[in-house]
A protein has these predicted regions:
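Short beta-strand element of the alpha/beta-hydrolase
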Residues: 49-58
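Accessory cap/linker subdomain of secreted extracellular hydrolases
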Residues: 62-66, 70-88, 92-99, 104, ...
Length: 372
């Protein structure tokens, strides 16, 4: 473990130079209420000013993709050998970018553990207004660091897409572009109450299996990271009673708040009239039980003058990592974060992968959505 070597690090932070990157682990970001979140910063070894790709969420920034979703990673790698190629895969993390494929292109990748999750203390309150504020603060923190060019982009799947809508509506100064990849926006309709009927299974199973399992304070009772050998949900270890006191029970909250007009839901809805940032909204035809409505609604209802819609098929996570998805993301962010004249402004506003029999997808370009 290397010692800290940056002014923004503290006694819990450390830095490594390996695999062509400088990695600053457990860097503190202080929130306006005093809570200190922890992030990992993957950046080029050479000092410079770079565009920033950021995510904030509850799945544990130290937790390797393979440590909890091995079957998904193996299947994706077998179907698309390009995904595990040209990278050691040491830093693969569920539903966020692989820094080994972004840092060489002169980006800084910042992963933040959300309040109460992973390495960040506090109380978990899933998709709350407080969490959206935290993300906005993190964006503006990243925008003024010595390695930043002042332009921050948000990019990630599912949870890491959903809170992009909320953050964009808060309009942090340094937010330059977003790419919500398969991300719901209306948690009442898209997740908890389909057609007004409570969805008992998902909210309970998902929150317990994917969020509370890596809650901050599980410490030595949780996962040990293969990335750096430290505890995913450390450094402290709390009792089950203490852990319970440090989270709002998402399932019980969903059950108790039965109407979409309840403050619990309205406080989690983005104000579309304030979502003005350039966006690439990427949906999946096959995820109708959760995410795609958010991507379509976000594209249609936001007031951004620079917005694109892309729709694809197959699994929920796969195309985010394939050459197809990476090409879209990198061209989009290069244009808006780095100022590259790469022709993105001529990209069709709507790009659809239309499904045909035999698992065949045919690309189709359109000028608007809904189609006319």
């Amino acid at each position: 473990m290397a010692k800290k070597n940056s002014s923004y690090m503290d006694d819990q932070s450390w830095s490594d130079v390996r695999d062509g990157m400088r990695i600053d682990w457990d860097v503190p970001i202080k929130m306006d209420d005093g809570v200190v979140l922890r992030c990992d910063v993957y950046r080029p070894i050479k000092n410079g000013k770079y565009g920033v790709i950021m995510t904030l969420g509850p799945y544990g920034k130290f937790l390797h993709f393979n440590e909890i979703y091995e079957d998904q990673f193996v299947r994706m790698s077998e179907d698309f050998p390009e995904v595990p190629s040209e990278t050691t895969n040491k830093y693969q993390n569920w539903e966020v970018v692989d820094p080994e494929k972004w840092v060489p292109d002169d980006y800084v990748c910042v992963r933040v553990d959300s309040r109460g999750a992973g390495r960040s203390p506090g109380v978990i309150d899933i998709w709350s207004g407080r969490e959206a504020q935290d993300l906005a603060i993190c964006v503006d923190w990243a925008g003024v660091q010595s390695w930043s060019n002042g332009k921050v982009g948000l990019n990630g799947i599912s949870y890491y897409a959903e809170n992009q809508w909320q953050c964009a509506a808060l309009q942090p100064k340094h937010l330059a572009a977003i790419c919500p990849w398969e991300g719901a926006a209306d948690y009442y309709r898209d997740m908890a109450h389909h057609g007004g009927i409570f969805c008992n299974g998902f909210t309970k199973v998902w929150s317990e299996a994917q969020v509370y399992s890596v809650q901050h304070g599980r410490g030595t009772n949780g996962f040990r990271s293969s990335m750096n050998g430290d505890w995913v949900s450390g450094p402290i270890t709390l009792t089950e009673e203490e852990l319970g006191a440090n989270r709002n029970n998402f399932y019980e909250d969903c059950l108790a708040n039965k109407l979409d007009t309840d403050e619990f839901w309205t406080s989690r809805m983005p104000d579309w009239s304030k979502v003005k940032v350039p966006m690439l909204s990427s949906a999946n035809w096959g995820g109708q039980g959760l995410h795609p409505r958010g991507n379509f609604e976000g594209f249609v209802r936001s007031v951004s003058k620079n917005k694109w819609l892309e729709v694809h098929g197959i699994e929920h996570w796969t195309h985010f990592y394939t050459n197809y998805g990476m090409d879209l993301q990198k061209r989009f962010f290069a244009y808006f974060l780095k100022g590259e004249k790469n022709g993105w402004n001529k990209q069709p506003k709507v790009q659809l992968q239309v499904r045909h029999p035999g698992e065949k997808f045919v690309e189709r370009h359109e000028k608007e959505w809904p189609l006319k």
